[in-house]
From Swiss-Prot:
Enzyme class: hydrolase
Protein's recorded name: RNA polymerase-associated protein RapA
Gene designation: rapA
Alphabetical UniProt keywords: Activator, ATP-binding, DNA-binding, Helicase, Hydrolase, Nucleotide-binding, Transcription, Transcription regulation
An annotated Gene Ontology molecular function: helicase activity
Organism listed in the record: Pectobacterium atrosepticum (strain SCRI 1043 / ATCC BAA-672)
Residue ranges annotated for the Helicase C-terminal domain, each copy included: 489-677
Amino acid sequence: MPFTLGQRWISDTESELGLGTVVAVNTRMITLLFPASGENRLYSRSDAPITRVMFNPGDTVTSHEGWQLKIDDVREEKGLLVYCGQRLDDETPAELREVFLDSKLTFNKPQDRLFAGQIDRMDRFALRYRARKHQNEQALQQWGGLRGMRASLIPHQLHIAYEVGQRHAPRVLLADEVGLGKTIEAGMIIHQQLLAGRASRVLIVVPETLQHQWLVEMLRRFNLLFSLFDDERYAEAKLDSSNPFETEQLVICSLGFVQRSAQRFAQLVNTDWDLLVVDEAHHLVWSEESPSPEYQAIEALARATPAVLLLTATPEQLGQQSHFARLRLLDPNRFHDYQEFVAEQQQYRPVADAVTLLLAGEKAQAAELNVLSDLLGEQDIEPLLKSINSDSDDNQKARQELITMLMDRHGTSRVLFRNTRQGVKGFPQRVLHQIRLPLPAQYQTAIKVSGIMNANKPLETRARDMLYPEQIYQQLEGDDATWWNFDPRVEWLLNYLTTNRDEKVLVICAQAATALQLEQVLRTREAIRAAVFHEGLSILERDRAAAYFASEEEGAQVLICSEIGSEGRNFQFASHLVMFDLPFNPDLLEQRIGRLDRIGQAKEIQVLVPYLENTAQALLVRWYHEGLDAFEHTCPTGRTIYDAHHAQLIERLTTVGEQQGLDEFIHTCRQQHDSLKQQLEQGRDRLLEMHSNGGEQAQLLAQAIAEQDNDVNLVTFALNLFDIVGINQEDRSDNLIILTPSDHMLVPDFPGLPQDGCTITFDRDQALSREDAQFISWEHPLIRNGLDLVLSGDTGSCAVSLLKNKALPVGTLLAELVYVVEAQAPKHLQLTRFLPPTPVRLLMDRKGTNLAAQVEFESFNRQLNAVNRHTSSKLVNAVQSDVHAMLQQAEALVETQARQLITEAQQQADLQLRRELERLEALKAVNPNIREDELTALENQREQVLSNLHEANWRLDAIRLVVVTHQ
């Protein structure tokens, strides 16, 4: 091609230089100036890796002065192009010589990039098309936010999360019994709300001791990186913003931190949170006359935040007044009068009794049939009532239908979810082993001396000290005191571990110092492999320790945890728990056993308690076991009895030698425990349990998600993505892959990939047993960021390939076109449920025939060969006019398909949202817990969704030219 001064060209190999201008030409060489980058390049005339930039009628170009021109015609004058058309700013006719084009011009349309020589690799085109297809398929899945969590698929948890996560601004109480996974349920709801765009700012308020547990759980299980706000972090953020809380989207803080400063609290309330989560909400004290400051603080936050999740103990444990106080935070208009609430609850008793009757499968008596008729009076249920007393096949179906109707009328079932272990099932037995050991003389002396020296300390402090004789001894003898040389618990532990070499054993003690000293003794005396877990370790260090313990090959036999260090970690792959000492209250005891006693635990849990006779430990073992039955069963009454007998218990712990009346004390506690437990059992609300555990629907949901695990398409796509992005992959045993950044990645920092790399697995069970392995799903940030990286930029948007096929004439030209049909709308409308960005593939020949239906993408792609960029540019220049004609023919074809997709999406959205609205309106007639704002929001959402779908459009997303060759 002849070169003329002033012509505009673009570099095939350095497109980032911008638009170049020919500034010098001689017989062998040409010089290009790239004004945007200030660079010069010298090229050989005969084989320069550059492409002439030529625009066509219909294109819009920008001048060096900034104004834009819509091109109507192009003419050539002395080797230079002149673009004629209309200016967009003042709509006047204008001409623009190519020398005056803006040098920073970028080519966004695939066809522009193709004609400008910015041609990508063939494998990137294939990756882009696959990314479009997978993104479309995943958007249509109805369980978004539930599949990617690093947790077992427990039906009742999935049911609650799905039920609540789908709502507009959910305001609910999660009150499952301990060990049933309230934190995971909350995490799934948060994850769903964030992915769906219903929430973007989340505040979690927890007791100070649980901050790190939540931080770890959200990161490890859901890949949600929360910021922990304490005094130090607050002071730092204050330098960047007048309201420090606006510097982060996802925040965790403690209730104490919230309350310590009026200014800070005001800033927190004035931040636009979308979702508020409050853990341990039962500690918020309320009475009609004097609500506590903590309660009032959360009340103010709940009033200012659209969505609220309260995590709390079960209503039966709390008592009705405390339960009402929680509900009042969620909906003060609905729950405004306590006496009215009590009366209303009494009315639900017959509903719950009716459900119990139907569940039992027994025939209903006349009085019971009358109760059912009264409860469901506005509907014709006569045929159903006849069926439940017949022996017909419809009996069970009729019972289920009546239960569903009753559930709709249940007062608080939309705002309260509560599962019990009894209702959920699947928990292991706990077996207690008490190991009584003699009290060493050294400890006897230390305890006596400590009692004299610390006589002025508060009684509770002295009682706590008495539980840890090794700490007392060390305080008296100094840091060099080697208590482990004479403490019989250490000798017993060594023998136990050497005898049970094949068992994974979790050892928990109160203090980090004790944990570290025990690890040293095990290592030096018996070469026992042990990992240590304490509050002084970072999250990453704890992950490594937990992974070392979890590993079957060369892993640690024992993990030694401090009380605080073990919070929020579960090790259900182990079944042996050694309590080297005992915690001070029953909640902490349950928390310790709860590390192993989870759903998914396959074996009986062996709870081993070595204790020293004639000490506070010995007394506490008896009280926990004989008084509360807290070792072998969960103890919902523990806190109530502990609070009632707190003073007497403390006194007995500090005066171990004088234990008159101990048997009576323990007997009294046991009687109260049995009585309270019986009351709780009688108060069980079977209807609420049914609603909360989801029944058969929950089982089907878990099954459906499990079937998507180990998705072969995900594995293939992910490995292909990592290859093309340039991420190093190293296969390890046990389905593990190590990913590390390389020096030649598409982007310098791939979002979600740490600088030092990470270990991944596609296997859920493997991820659960390996704390250091990330569980890769379609919802994982590595995959979502990878999809965004490919689809939001130009990666793979144009390519050229050769097809070796002797059945076709040489030079046959095909254009593979990928259009995207999409609607632009705010994320919270979730338009992707109905019309996610949808790829439409056409395969055009020169005659305008679409061959896509006959030629499947993957098989076609396997037959193609790559072409280098320079040759590709020459091919494109040779067939440019043909490609323009093919694109025009394709426009008419794609319009038909696109309009059909848009119409179907509109119909589906209208039907689904109308049904949802009608269901809620029908429920509102019989259940006052349907909030008016929910109905209004749903109606508004329907109108906005349909309006935005009406505006949906389509565009060319990628183009690949295919030329037939016989060589």
